[in-house]
Design a protein with these regions (language model features):
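Phosphate-group recognition and catalysis centered on beta-loop-alpha active-site segments
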Residues: 2-284
Length: 284
């Protein structure tokens, strides 16, 4: 009972920081789990994130031949499993008979997880960010309901509000939905205005390949709406050059993570979760 209460408090704390206005608290989002130390999108990688104190883990979804949602980034299993072909051409049992590969392409003991397995592992411990998974919105929501984890999952899409609402109806209002906006592309401001008019999202994922004045003005516009900012530090083209490797390899964390925080970001998605957590703890 005590352990359950602690877990519930952990999710409540993360949700409060995600949904509220607490600029002093930065949430760390780990991209494809802890892929440097475990197979990407694996249960072990997710457990590593839980153990190190990550706030949210990012995953991707595909559907098997027999209709199960599994956690996989690519359309094929060629890169990440000891097999070849499209995920959709295999049954879940066939995929489970194979093994995931690690970052240097060696077969491990780990199996591809289902969304249900991931949500049960994460329940009460860590938030989940479904990135490549909008195509399965309704099916994913059914899994969240079944596992009792609707309150700890974020679903995202880079689509206009009108399309997302038309395709999902009332379900859209039952989840934490985060629009993805590419600030360096035409129409970005119109997408922001559309969402602000209709739903005022808890946060926007902002993508930008430069940090010119036009992009910075749009970042400020989103910040001024009261919605939180989710910014990727994964590689330069996602954050105007203020990426993880700039922090780690060039030893310029203030020009990377510090710059992102100074733009008002509440959530930082990283491929260096342990180092970002260390950086944030030192800043307290």
């Amino acid at each position: 009972m005590v352990q359950l209460a602690v877990a519930q408090n952990r999710i409540a704390e993360i949700r409060e920081n995600l949904l509220g206005n607490h600029p002093d608290k930065i949430l760390v989002v780990s991209h494809r789990a802890d892929w440097r130390n475990a197979p990407e999108n694996s249960l072990q990688g997710i457990q590593n994130c839980i153990d190190m104190g990550v706030d949210m883990v990012e995953i991707d979804l595909k559907r098997t031949k027999d209709g199960h949602l599994v956690v996989m980034h690519d359309k094929t299993i060629n890169r990440t499993m000891n097999g070849k072909g499209l995920v959709e051409d295999y049954t879940l049992a066939e995929l489970k008979a194979m093994r995931l590969k690690n970052g240097v392409a060696c077969k491990t003991r780990h199996q591809i997880p289902t969304l249900e397995e991931v949500m049960l592992l994460c329940k009460g411990k860590i938030m989940v960010n479904i990135d490549k998974g909008y195509d399965y919105f309704q099916e994913a929501y059914a899994v969240l309901e079944k596992t009792g984890t609707v309150d700890q999952c974020v679903i995202k899409a880079g689509l206009p509000y009108e399309q997302v609402k038309a395709e999902n109806g009332a379900v859209l209002d039952k989840v934490i939905f985060m629009p993805i906006v590419q600030l360096h592309k035409e129409g970005a401001e119109a997408i922001i205005d559309s969402y602000q008019t209709h739903m005022k999202p808890a946060a926007y994922e902002l993508v930008f390949d430069n940090d010119n004045p036009e992009v910075l003005n749009l970042i400020k516009k989103v910040r001024d709406t009261g919605s939180n900012l989710f910014i990727n530090s994964l590689w330069p083209e996602l954050c105007g050059g203020h990426d993880d490797d700039r922090a780690v390899e060039l030893h310029q964390p203030e020009e990377s993570w510090g710059w992102i925080i100074n733009q008002g970001a509440k959530l930082i998605q990283t491929d260096r979760p342990a180092l970002l957590l260390e950086y944030l703890r030192k800043k307290k």
